[in-house]
């Protein structure tokens, strides 16, 4: 056996046979051990050869394993290294001879299989008994390896290379496993034109992610199957090449190149009958290159592309095409670009209508046409970082999935009843242990109540199961209908018109009638527990879940809340009616849908002296909209006093440190597009900083340092300033005109002047500040009571027209907070006490004491 040259797979099989014989306690390795080993290999060629010979490899493997299990077992030290017996050696010799006849340099696993079948062993008898004779196996070689010779140690990776490393899209289209492609006729026609050229017949589809590049190729596969293509493409096979699986497991240098070459040779050998598709085309640049080798996949296919021997359709995004393909001009010139643009909202609705039935069948729900329109419109308006039709399809898919989950989950009424029944059952167990008369009477009543609740529960469960069964029936019928339609198309292509007539005029109308009856039963049910229809409201809920933007119809409670927005804001911001009304009107316009959808919800410049409530109003708006005053983007403009600091807002430009981190403003709004943005103390910033806000105020968009467009159309922009504070309204406006450029002022929705606070208004602020202090003390279970005289004292002493309400906060802190802290530390006041604050010593100070 010195001249025996096994391939890598054959060596692995021989090693596996040795290990199995050793583990089984067999004293020698027999042909059956080898047969089990070669059929058990994951990527082996022996199993496909048996299949080609008309034999089931799984049956042979199971029978061979039985033979191995029946061999005599021995014990001793030489069991760790059993030797091949005479029959096994004969099989190896026969396979070496056959390899020589075939012109192979190495013995591959399928040749070893033929060698086993040629011998006289129990394994050979098993193969012959199942029809896998030596001649049958030799004849099957042709279908697996063709005319290829084994000239390397890993030839198995090259046999049936196309089958291993590609997906036949035309086969999937024939089986009806590809979604229909709606529209895109122009792009498909252009692809067909390029493919029909004599040389450089290689179109590359370029477009943004999610616009439907791969779908165009799937549409081409469907057209090839339907025969709706020119003569040059009729009957051709369209395959999708999987470079990932080609690279995966290529352990040795040159192994990837061998696999790719085998694929390319098979494609060349098909004489133009195969059209190849590579998704993510940029991956061919650099794929397989290692160390000093420059021979990557891109360089290997260049000659074939230039000569027209390989018809290749590629798909990649604009950025990746520029980054990888355009750099290699020799590769780029071999491709013809086909630009795939984003479809319009109207075209997207058409695409969704074409896909609707597939999603209805998959999820077992109905999808309203108005829901498809809503998905296209809402995704276009609110999900700006992605592209149609992908984002609209995702919306419909998730909305249907959400509905299906609700159908499969137990309804709320049943959950509530089950909780009641469980509680009553626990009470019943507890009461059975009691012996007094009252407990026995209570037990009687409880058992009666429990019986009623159980009856109600079983009725509800039966109703739910019935409704669910009808919905499941519709789903089953629709799946059946889709299968019949696919079968009908296949029969029509094959010319079996009798079968077509039977399906189209018999079984399909019958099923459609059943579906209509079942859907009528669902629709006609009163007080239905389950909803099985995707409506625009469900789509809007999904949009809200994705973006945080309330896109759905307003509930009654929200309508009342919006109508009374001034009252809510007025509780926190005292004496600024004009400002509160301006902001409230902007929010109402946006939620009612009458605002300009291409501008921010509102943009305001708040002017006024310090401490009158400018920043407080921005916090109040955030609390009103998001139930949290901190849920806003706050930019302190005093940090942007230098010209270059604008880069902090939108992110550093390319080449600078921190380029990939994004800007403080743009990143915050990208993460949360529905928010309040507060630019505090704008007069402190450098004037050039406001130039970047011009596009935000006018078009609701801003481009960040990485070239991404950030959507500001659902934000409220509030700028605060105390320019001209202390002067008249006219003086304030003059100061604004001096500080800001006219084009900036002109883009604001409103400039709101805050009035100085009067002493009466300060009395209301005293109430607000004291209630905030009381809230902080509630953690220690302290109850705070401030007398009217003390409140008046605070309002008088805390009033300063130049500084607004801030001196009052300091006064409360000093007059009440400091004393209270000392009393708590001294133990005079303990947790849970009532605290009284009153005027003392003829109004000289406030006294804080425990109320008895």
Swiss-Prot record:
Residues 160-342 are annotated as: NBD1. Residues 558-756 are annotated as: NBD2. Residues 343-548 are annotated as: Linker. The gene is clpB. This is Chaperone protein ClpB. Its main location: cytoplasm. The Clp repeat (R) domain probably functions as a substrate-discriminating domain, recruiting aggregated proteins to the ClpB hexamer and/or stabilizing bound proteins. The NBD2 domain is responsible for oligomerization, whereas the NBD1 domain stabilizes the hexamer probably in an ATP-dependent manner. The movement of the coiled-coil domain is essential for ClpB ability to rescue proteins from an aggregated state, probably by pulling apart large aggregated proteins, which are bound between the coiled-coils motifs of adjacent ClpB subunits in the functional hexamer. ATP 2 binds at residues 608-615.
